[in-house]
Amino acid sequence: MASKYRGYYHDEASSAAGGGGGGGGGDGYRREKQVRKKRLTAQKRKEIKEAFDLFDTDGSGTIDPKELNVAMRALGFEMTPEQIHQMIAEVDKDGSGTIDFDEFVHMMTDKMGERDAREELNKAFKIIDKDNNGKISDVDIQRLAIETGEPFTLDEVREMIEAADENGDGEVDHEEFLKMMKRIGFGAGFF
């Protein structure tokens, strides 16, 4: 039973938000991320190059942690020093402690994908929360199930709510929704 509604949440929430669905845990998200990397437009690559050159303040051809922090802030990402160092470690293939342009492109493509996944989940939440009260109730899920032709009993719907409802109020708020989606593997990269 649990796998049934996990697939439902993943497939319906992601397709409601324009995602690819997939139902295979995080496989659909990973597949979308790979396609997105391949589709990096020449314009986006040019913008990333301009940002790289702008923030490579010493002209070394690499970005160090201080330069990366400034770059990320300028691109709309507020990050702690620990997050900056972790980002560098994740893409720094040569262990230099700095990021060259190719490493920067890889990192920024991942960050853009994370932002896209969060936007998809936010859209999905709004679609499910039809009455716009900031919470998903059993009524919201039953309505969506009817609209999509998914035959769920009231007990199944309540079980779905209980699985995600951390504060015990009988509804799923936005934060609980994001945590639940992380548990089932959708958009795991941005958490």
UniProtKB/Swiss-Prot annotation:
<feature type="binding site">
    <location>
        <position position="94"/>
    </location>
    <ligand>
        <name>Ca(2+) 2</name>
    </ligand>
</feature>
<feature type="binding site">
    <location>
        <position position="135"/>
    </location>
    <ligand>
        <name>Ca(2+) 3</name>
    </ligand>
</feature>
<feature type="region of interest" description="Disordered">
    <location>
        <begin position="1"/>
        <end position="41"/>
    </location>
</feature>
<feature type="binding site">
    <location>
        <position position="58"/>
    </location>
    <ligand>
        <name>Ca(2+) 1</name>
    </ligand>
</feature>
<keyword id="KW-0677">Repeat</keyword>
<dbReference type="InterPro" id="IPR018247">
    <property type="entry name" value="EF_Hand_1_Ca_BS"/>
</dbReference>
<dbReference type="InterPro" id="IPR002048">
    <property type="entry name" value="EF_hand_dom"/>
</dbReference>
<keyword id="KW-0106">Calcium</keyword>
<feature type="binding site">
    <location>
        <position position="92"/>
    </location>
    <ligand>
        <name>Ca(2+) 2</name>
    </ligand>
</feature>
<feature type="binding site">
    <location>
        <position position="131"/>
    </location>
    <ligand>
        <name>Ca(2+) 3</name>
    </ligand>
</feature>
<feature type="domain" description="EF-hand 1">
    <location>
        <begin position="43"/>
        <end position="78"/>
    </location>
</feature>
<feature type="binding site">
    <location>
        <position position="169"/>
    </location>
    <ligand>
        <name>Ca(2+) 4</name>
    </ligand>
</feature>
<dbReference type="GO" id="GO:0005814">
    <property type="term" value="C:centriole"/>
</dbReference>
<feature type="compositionally biased region" description="Gly residues">
    <location>
        <begin position="17"/>
        <end position="27"/>
    </location>
</feature>
<comment type="function">
    <text>Potential calcium sensor.</text>
</comment>
<dbReference type="GO" id="GO:0005634">
    <property type="term" value="C:nucleus"/>
</dbReference>
<feature type="binding site">
    <location>
        <position position="165"/>
    </location>
    <ligand>
        <name>Ca(2+) 4</name>
    </ligand>
</feature>
<feature type="binding site">
    <location>
        <position position="96"/>
    </location>
    <ligand>
        <name>Ca(2+) 2</name>
    </ligand>
</feature>
<feature type="domain" description="EF-hand 2">
    <location>
        <begin position="79"/>
        <end position="114"/>
    </location>
</feature>
<keyword id="KW-0479">Metal-binding</keyword>
<feature type="binding site">
    <location>
        <position position="167"/>
    </location>
    <ligand>
        <name>Ca(2+) 4</name>
    </ligand>
</feature>
<feature type="binding site">
    <location>
        <position position="140"/>
    </location>
    <ligand>
        <name>Ca(2+) 3</name>
    </ligand>
</feature>
<feature type="binding site">
    <location>
        <position position="98"/>
    </location>
    <ligand>
        <name>Ca(2+) 2</name>
    </ligand>
</feature>
<feature type="binding site">
    <location>
        <position position="171"/>
    </location>
    <ligand>
        <name>Ca(2+) 4</name>
    </ligand>
</feature>
<feature type="binding site">
    <location>
        <position position="176"/>
    </location>
    <ligand>
        <name>Ca(2+) 4</name>
    </ligand>
</feature>
<dbReference type="InterPro" id="IPR011992">
    <property type="entry name" value="EF-hand-dom_pair"/>
</dbReference>
<feature type="binding site">
    <location>
        <position position="67"/>
    </location>
    <ligand>
        <name>Ca(2+) 1</name>
    </ligand>
</feature>
<dbReference type="GO" id="GO:0000226">
    <property type="term" value="P:microtubule cytoskeleton organization"/>
</dbReference>
<feature type="domain" description="EF-hand 3">
    <location>
        <begin position="116"/>
        <end position="151"/>
    </location>
</feature>
<dbReference type="Pfam" id="PF13499">
    <property type="entry name" value="EF-hand_7"/>
</dbReference>
<feature type="binding site">
    <location>
        <position position="56"/>
    </location>
    <ligand>
        <name>Ca(2+) 1</name>
    </ligand>
</feature>
<dbReference type="GO" id="GO:0005509">
    <property type="term" value="F:calcium ion binding"/>
</dbReference>
<feature type="binding site">
    <location>
        <position position="133"/>
    </location>
    <ligand>
        <name>Ca(2+) 3</name>
    </ligand>
</feature>
<feature type="binding site">
    <location>
        <position position="62"/>
    </location>
    <ligand>
        <name>Ca(2+) 1</name>
    </ligand>
</feature>
<feature type="binding site">
    <location>
        <position position="129"/>
    </location>
    <ligand>
        <name>Ca(2+) 3</name>
    </ligand>
</feature>
<feature type="binding site">
    <location>
        <position position="103"/>
    </location>
    <ligand>
        <name>Ca(2+) 2</name>
    </ligand>
</feature>
<dbReference type="InterPro" id="IPR003299">
    <property type="entry name" value="Calflagin-bd"/>
</dbReference>
<dbReference type="InterPro" id="IPR050230">
    <property type="entry name" value="CALM/Myosin/TropC-like"/>
</dbReference>
<feature type="domain" description="EF-hand 4">
    <location>
        <begin position="152"/>
        <end position="187"/>
    </location>
</feature>
<protein>
    <recommendedName>
        <fullName>Probable calcium-binding protein CML8</fullName>
    </recommendedName>
</protein>
<feature type="binding site">
    <location>
        <position position="60"/>
    </location>
    <ligand>
        <name>Ca(2+) 1</name>
    </ligand>
</feature>
